[in-house]
Amino acid sequence: MSPQDRPSRTTEAFFGRRRGKPVRPQQAAALESGLDAYRLDLTADAPSDLRTLFETEVSAVRLEIGFGGGEHLLHRAIEAPTTGFIGVEPFVNGMAKMMMAVRARPLANLRVHDDDATRLLDWLPPASLGGIDLLYPDPWPKKKHWKRRFVSPVNLERFARVLKPGAKFRFASDIDTYVNWTLLHCRAHGAFAWQAAEAADWHRPYEGWPGTRYEAKAIREGRRPAYLTFVRK
């Protein structure tokens, strides 16, 4: 996407690098070497065919935004070696965990971005992704902060641009207000069709779902996760 075509970020929340607890020396070493090997270079033009980004032959490319500690992304990348996966995680501690995992088990079908997800979305060519996962994003529970949620009209427009027709946007959350928010925004957008045949569908985990530590905590605390799937028209 050319600079003049990019949506303005003046009214958007910035999803840039964040740090929590100090990373251990071993994690810091894995982070440095891992990012050298797996990080995408957004200063270069994006290839017209994203499959060329990977060190192995892949048939499709998927994106996961905010992969946390990487449990789901790692599981999917191992499960589907002929699919290329791009993972975004601006939280340094989460990226360090992921880089520790791939140091122990290298993955030729993985690339990562450790900064603002919207910059990556604007870098990608149109109709280049076979799917987007947004799993347990920051819910910004206070109503005055809802405008900071990642699901927004401008970001759904980004999703619509980069997803291939028929590709799926999957969203999981245990926060009812965010689930309703996402349903309303996606149904209002026009480019997405909610894929749910019956009421129970949106409480049924995705096929092959490995679960995450965050999800397990939510269930222990009595919150019921929802799993939404939207198809790009």
Swiss-Prot record:
Molecular function as annotated in GO: tRNA (guanine(46)-N7)-methyltransferase activity
Matching SUPFAM superfamilies: S-adenosyl-L-methionine-dependent methyltransferases (SSF53335)
Pathway entry: tRNA modification; N(7)-methylguanine-tRNA biosynthesis
Annotated EC: 2.1.1.33
Cellular component terms (Gene Ontology): tRNA methyltransferase complex
Annotated keywords: Methyltransferase, S-adenosyl-L-methionine, Transferase, tRNA processing
Keyword field contains tRNA processing: yes
Segments for region (Disordered): 1-23
Presence of the UniProt keyword ATP-binding in the record: no
Reactions catalysed: guanosine(46) in tRNA + S-adenosyl-L-methionine = N(7)-methylguanosine(46) in tRNA + S-adenosyl-L-homocysteine
Active-site residue numbers: D138
Enzyme kind, highest EC tier: transferase
Record: residues binding S-adenosyl-L-methionine: E64, E89, D116, D138
InterPro entries documented for this protein: SAM-dependent_MTases_sf, tRNA_(Gua-N-7)_MeTrfase_Trmb, tRNA_methyltr_TrmB_bact
PANTHER family with a match to the protein in the record: 3-DEOXY-D-MANNO-OCTULOSONIC-ACID TRANSFERASE/TRNA GUANINE-N 7 - -METHYLTRANSFERASE (PTHR23417), PENTACOTRIPEPTIDE-REPEAT REGION OF PRORP DOMAIN-CONTAINING PROTEIN (PTHR23417:SF14)
Job of this protein: Catalyzes the formation of N(7)-methylguanine at position 46 (m7G46) in tRNA.
UniProt record similarity statement: Belongs to the class I-like SAM-binding methyltransferase superfamily. TrmB family.
Protein's name in the database: tRNA (guanine-N(7)-)-methyltransferase
